[in-house]
């Protein structure tokens, strides 16, 4: 648990009531303590909460993904840069090389071609949901669409999807270290076996494309790089979108004026999804960075060798960037937010997440115009994760289907 005191108020960070509504704590930090050193289980971490600081930090080469900057200089050469060659844990030129290779398969055109299939999945799920009685919308809808999409995209067999989703949740939530290590081992082993099957029985899915991809110099992804990339795509490819859908649906259910606007003009769904990403960001904090040298943000100097977290959810509600940040407005232009990062680490799957959000939320409210929460807001339970923000469950009454 980390505690911040601002004025006469105390705010728990990453514990207690924080999970239900973190925004008062973020607002207090932005106003009076925007570069805050926190005591977390993995060690002290500096949290940046202002939009300008977070956006600048994404492109600051002094903030490295190389954990060895926390070690004395004479010990660094004997240690591996990262325990697994995952792109989001790398600096250039290693990051540049992997991004170039993967980008050949993960194109905007390929993502846009998925829209008919995403719509088919959403409509099929909606057709099977009852009109009465409580339904857990997270489990039966928000979770199902991204999982089916990313598994089909990568070529993961349907019978394996529940296992991989369970491992992913353990890795993303604030689970015990032993549980995380066990889940990582199981996921690594599963993906290694799956990639071997793809070598002998290739298909038209993304994993087979990654096996075949090479650049003009003949460079290819190694086996460990392939496993790490598959792991990243599987986890990031559904965790963000599940929470985008859930948070977006809840935002509309709790803001009837905005729900009415969308019902009257369904073309607002694109700007609505951008606003959902800003208003209740599905990714709360970016992965840890390490200071390669002293850095200064908002007048506070962070020494070399320290860990730094970039507060995406806090930055996206910064009034210095977005007027009236605590008001939901699906007609505003929320582009420019740091929902998916910024710079060289901008999320490779941002286009797909936005597309899934537009289809899932748009089809849901068009199909079930009387959709309503089945419990009070104080009964909703959020996941306890420093990385993502989303509901564990969302009991709803679906209501009759539209004519």
UniProtKB/Swiss-Prot annotation:
Subcellular location: Cytoplasm
Organism in which the protein naturally occurs: Pseudonocardia autotrophica (Amycolata autotrophica)
Protein name: Vitamin D(3) 25-hydroxylase
Principal subcellular localisation of the protein: cytoplasm
GO cellular component: cytoplasm
Residues reported to bind heme: 347
Cofactor dependence: heme
Enzyme class at the top of the EC tree: oxidoreductase
Regulation: Activated by partially methylated beta-cyclodextrin.
Annotated disulfide bonds: none
């Amino acid at each position: 648990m980390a505690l911040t005191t601002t004025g006469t108020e105390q705010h728990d960070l990453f514990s207690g009531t924080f999970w239900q509504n973190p925004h008062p704590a973020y607002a207090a930090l932005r106003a009076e303590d925007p570069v805050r050193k926190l005591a977390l289980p993995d060690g002290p971490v500096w949290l940046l909460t202002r939009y300008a600081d977070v956006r600048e930090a994404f492109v600051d080469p002094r903030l490295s993904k190389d954990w060895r900057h926390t070690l004395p200089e004479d010990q660094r050469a004997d240690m591996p840069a990262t325990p697994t060659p995952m792109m989001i844990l790398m600096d250039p030129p290693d990051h540049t090389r992997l991004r170039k290779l993967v980008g050949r398969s993960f194109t905007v055109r390929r993502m846009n071609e998925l829209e008919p299939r995403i719509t088919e999945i959403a409509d099929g799920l909606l057709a099977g949901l009852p009109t009465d009685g409580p339904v857990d919308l997270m489990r039966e809808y928000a979770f199902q669409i991204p999982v089916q999409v990313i598994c089909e995209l990568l070529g993961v067999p349907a019978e394996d999807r529940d296992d991989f989703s369970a491992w992913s949740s353990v890795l993303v939530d604030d689970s015990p270290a032993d549980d995380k290590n066990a889940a990582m081992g199981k996921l690594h082993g599963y993906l290694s076996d799956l990639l071997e099957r793809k070598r002998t029985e290739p298909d038209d899915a993304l994993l087979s494309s990654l096996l075949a991809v090479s650049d003009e110099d003949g460079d290819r992804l190694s086996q460990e790089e392939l496993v790490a990339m598959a792991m990243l795509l599987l986890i990031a490819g559904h965790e963000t979108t599940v929470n985008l859908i859930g948070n977006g649906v809840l935002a509309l259910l709790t803001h009837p004026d905005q729900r009415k606007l969308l019902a009257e003009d369904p073309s607002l769904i694109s700007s609505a999804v951008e606003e959902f990403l800003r208003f209740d960001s599905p990714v709360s904090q970016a992965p840890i960075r390490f200071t390669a040298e002293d850095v200064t943000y908002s007048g506070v100097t962070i020494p070399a060798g320290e860990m730094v977290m970039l507060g995406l959810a806090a930055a996206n509600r910064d009034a210095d960037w977005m007027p009236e940040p605590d008001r939901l407005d699906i007609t505003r232009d929320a582009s420019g937010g740091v929902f998916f990062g910024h710079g060289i680490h901008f999320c490779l799957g941002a286009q797909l997440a936005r597309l899934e959000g537009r289809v899932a939320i748009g089809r849901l409210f068009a199909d079930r115009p009387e959709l309503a929460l089945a419990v009070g807001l104080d009964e909703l339970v959020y996941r306890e994760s420093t990385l993502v923000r989303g509901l564990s469950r969302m009991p709803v009454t679906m209501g009759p289907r539209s004519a």
